[in-house]
Amino acid sequence: MNRCILLLLGALLLVQGLHVHKRQQKLRTVSLKKQPTLRETLLQAGSFETFAKHRHGYKKYLKTNGNHHFDKYQALNVEGEIDELLRNYMDAQYFGTISIGTPAQNFTVIFDTGSSNLWIPSKKCPFYDIACMLHHRYDSKSSSTYKEDGRKMAIQYGTGSMKGFISKDSVCVAGVCAEDQPFAEATSEPGITFVAAKFDGILGMAYPEIAVLGVQPVFNTLFEQKKVPSNLFSFWLNRNPDSEIGGEITFGGIDSRRYVEPITYVPVTRKGYWQFKMDKVVGSGVLGCSNGCQAIADTGTSLIAGPKAQIEAIQNFIGAEPLIKGEYMISCDKVPTLPPVSFVIGGQEFSLKGEDYVLKVSQGGKTICLSGFMGIDLPERVGELWILGDVFIGRYYSVFDFDQNRVGFAQAKTADGRPVDPAPRPFRSVFDNESEESMEQDDE
């Protein structure tokens, strides 16, 4: 009897100890800074033509080459080149700091849920690579924890290839370090995007399945090495332009201070991007995705992108006027009265107000308002695909869960803890309302 009691007490103490250990492994957060996008930088310099030509060339590239990436991720080839066809970074604006090596070398990166590799400029890039020379560069000779790998790799963007090679070192983020983490030292960076970029490199947070050379992403290494408590991370972006706080990423959990329950979860439909089924896009009626479609939650762009014809329907609905090469402008005076555009996900309606989907930028000392919706024509075989960037994620707290292969969205809070209205609500179509009214009339 006494032996049984002792065994029971021992088991209870063991369980209690496990709980204490779990509590001691705290959540890790990365503070994000919000910077002007390259779009805004070019516009402020009066270079709209340069910006538009660059964006037009990117979309033309998508139309021509958009099928490569979607053929069962065939881009994981011998040469280690992958087509990051949805990557642009012209509109990226949320950046955070990581360190690599011992002693630490600091870099500003985009935490990008639309790609899976970490790359930063290399000290070994040639002097004529302007993009590389204008940013912080990793020096392997200065790090005592550096390990050589040497595999060559390239990532094809709309403006050319980022080329480099794989190295290993300690990569630290949010106060924890991924030891012997493979990453790419970039020796060639393409186009104006990376020359004028406010960031040094990219830290991909999508699934390992789309990583160049099968390199394990940083977050997955952190979880594997037991540096974070749970196999998920979450994004809170602050859309207030007057706030110094750009946002936060929580590694290994969810920050209850940043959102209002409940979280609406939808399953990942394909392990690669954070891809899920979206029910439809609605305004006064259905504007797009009428029969359901695939969508991607993407922190690497600030825009919302979709099939060109459906995006044009949205532009017409909100009263946007064509500007140049696919760009649309809205009168800034009309922003407060613009109609909401809603995205139905998991049966819930997530609405964006005019102030959410309009981007205000300065050009020649004047403020102009641009639509945050962009049309992209992908090959027919790819199917209907939408990209929900920071215009959406900035409005809704977003959870990326590897363990349960799901994405979650919830009503976000402001930096001072106030809920950002409106809250998500169950979707009820016009047909539902008409049906109810018809039933009421029949009862009478």
UniProtKB/Swiss-Prot annotation:
> Disulfide connectivity?
C125-C132, C289-C293, C332-C369
Q: Which Gene3D superfamilies match?
A: 2.60.40.1960, Acid Proteases (2.40.70.10)
Q: Where is the Peptidase A1 domain?
A: 94-410
Signal peptide range equals 1-17
Does the entry feature the keyword Manganese, yes or no? no
An individual GO BP term: programmed necrotic cell death
**What SUPFAM superfamilies has UniProt attached to this entry?**
Acid proteases
Residues with an annotated glycan are: N106, N433
Q: What does the tissue specificity note say?
A: Highly expressed in intestine and to a lower extent in body wall muscles, hypodermis and neurons.
The protein's UniProt keywords, in alphabetical order, are:
Aspartyl protease, Cytoplasm, Disulfide bond, Glycoprotein, Hydrolase, Lysosome, Necrosis, Protease, Secreted, Signal
Q: Which InterPro entries match?
A: Aspartic_peptidase_A1, Aspartic_peptidase_AS, PEPTIDASE_A1, Peptidase_aspartic_dom_sf
Provide GO CC annotations from the record.
cytoplasm; extracellular region; lysosome
Q: What class of enzyme is it?
A: hydrolase
Q: Note down the stretches annotated as region Disordered.
A: 413-444
Acidic residues compositional bias, start-end: 433-444
One GO MF term: aspartic-type endopeptidase activity
Q: Which family does it belong to?
A: Belongs to the peptidase A1 family.
Please name the PANTHER family in this protein's record: BETA-SITE APP-CLEAVING ENZYME, ISOFORM A-RELATED
Q: What is this protein called?
A: Aspartic protease 4
